Design a protein with these regions (language model features):
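G-domain G4 guanine-recognition motif of GTPases
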Residues: 36, 66-72, 94-111, 125-133, ...
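Conserved C-terminal guanine-recognition region of P-loop GTPase G domains, centered on the G4
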Residues: 21-29, 34, 48-124, 181-197, ...
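Switch I (effector-binding) loop of TRAFAC-class P-loop GTPase G-domains
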Residues: 2-29
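Flexible beta-alpha connector loops of hexameric P-loop NTPases
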Residues: 6-8, 37-47
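C-terminal effector/interaction modules appended to NTPase cores
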Residues: 179-377
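Canonical P-loop GTPase G-domain recognition
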Residues: 91-97, 102-158, 165-167, 196-198, ...
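Long, well-ordered amphipathic alpha-helical subdomains in the mid-to-C-terminal portions
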Residues: 159-187
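Helical mechanochemical/support elements of P-loop NTPase systems and associated helical scaffolds
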Residues: 11, 15, 19, 45, ...
Length: 377
């Protein structure tokens, strides 16, 4: 970025929590750079800082590992932790870029570079703060490391094409942020415009009026999951129906797994325990979908004795074995890599998982009637 974003010093423990910096990196597009705490931190809080680093690793789509060239000794020994992390990322199918820093302080840095390349079977790129000429090669290598399918999945999949008429039903109630639209709505509108679709956006109370104003029925209606029932009852028969949350189930997660998870709702009881996981951090308001609406729908069916826990942000239990079902939000605030890491944890512990929109579609009896699209999951 060319900016002083993090405090940098030779003192261990300078970086405590991961530092996030968003920027535009051409030709990739918008990226977030995460500067983590050192994994060699042996201070009293070191283990907790390393846990934060591991959490950041779950979100990482490309890992950059720094090796200090002025370290003395056999690379296999002095870089043991760095090599462990490189192996960890490879196991997670995450590309790794190795940088050898402080080359101006080590006369034998070329030998070190060759040895690390032998150990990792990866190219190592030398960098030096006093000579930024090597950064161009690093940027080129970074771009080459980006997965070929990065950014290729689209939100609406194969549901629309050039010239299609699409209606978006977006309640602007007490939960809607002041003066702006929520991220899934913004991203969906932008994608539809890029795909040359004709887009009409309405609030729930103007849904029927909006249909009347159209010269033809929309090919696709995308609604907020909370008003699935109302929109289904009033939509034209020929119009496909889905929701932002269902689309994001495929865009950010594993839609087939979510659908199978939703079917396990029918096997819950009043003694079941459910985890509702919200990615964004906000103060819950009246009729919050995760805190009130979905719990109310579940307890209406199975009784008030059902135990429902909530987590938000990056809080997500390592041990999920005590839950009968996990209900994840759409995941718009996190990247797909991180949502899939949550899904992988649930799968490994044999805990069913679904998301908000798929849950509501199942509970309202229209899960087998809505449109999903293909090509994302």
């Amino acid at each position: 970025t060319g900016q002083e974003v993090s405090i940098v010093a030779d003192v261990a423990g300078t970086t405590t929590d991961p530092v996030y910096k968003a920027m535009e990196l051409h030709p990739i597009g918008p990226v977030t750079i995460i500067d983590t705490a050192g994994f060699d931190d042996e201070s009293e809080l070191g283990s907790r800082r390393v846990q934060k680093t591991k959490l950041a690793a779950e979100k990482t789509e490309l890992a950059v590992i720094l090796l200090a060239a002025d370290e003395k000794g056999e690379p296999a020994d002095i870089y043991a932790q760095e090599l462990e992390w490189a192996a960890y990322f490879k196991k997670k199918h995450t590309p790794v870029l190795l940088l050898l820093s402080k080359t101006d302080l080590a006369a034998d840095w070329k030998q070190t570079k060759e040895r690390v390349e032998q150990l990792t079977k990866e190219s190592v790129y030398p960098i030096c703060s006093s000579d930024p000429s090597g950064l161009a090669a690093v940027k080129e290598a970074l771009i080459r490391k980006v997965p070929e399918n990065f950014g290729s999945p689209c939100i609406t999949g194969d549901l629309v094409e050039d010239g299609d008429l699409v209606m978006l039903v977006m309640p602007q109630d007490i939960q809607a942020p002041k003066g702006r639209l929520i991220l899934p709505q913004v991203q969906t509108i932008r994608e539809l415009l890029d795909r040359k679709c004709l887009v009409m956006s309405v609030t729930t109370d103007k849904f029927v009026n909006g249909l009347s104003a159209m010269s033809r029925a929309p090919k696709l209606i995308i609604t907020d999951s909370q008003v699935f029932g109302h929109v289904w009852d009033h939509k034209p028969k020929e119009s496909m129906l889905t929701s932002f949350s269902v689309l994001f189930a495929a865009y950010k997660g594993d839609l087939p797994y979510y659908i199978e998870g939703a079917k396990t709702i029918d096997r819950l009881t009043g003694d079941s325990r459910v985890l509702i996981a919200e990615c964004c951090t906000h103060a819950p308001l009246k009729e919050d979908i995760g805190r009130e609406k979905i719990p109310r729908m579940l307890r209406k069916r199975y009784g008030e004795t059902m135990k429902i826990d909530h987590v938000s942000g990056t809080d997500y239990p390592q041990d999920l074995s005590g839950y009968d079902l996990i209900i994840q939000c759409g995941g718009c605030m996190f990247n797909r890599k991180y949502i899939l890491s949550r899904i992988d944890r649930a799968k490994a512990q044999h805990v069913p998982m679904t998301n908000y929109g798929v849950t509501i579609a199942h509970l309202t009896g229209i899960l087998d009637k809505i449109a999903y699209g293909s090509g994302n999951s």
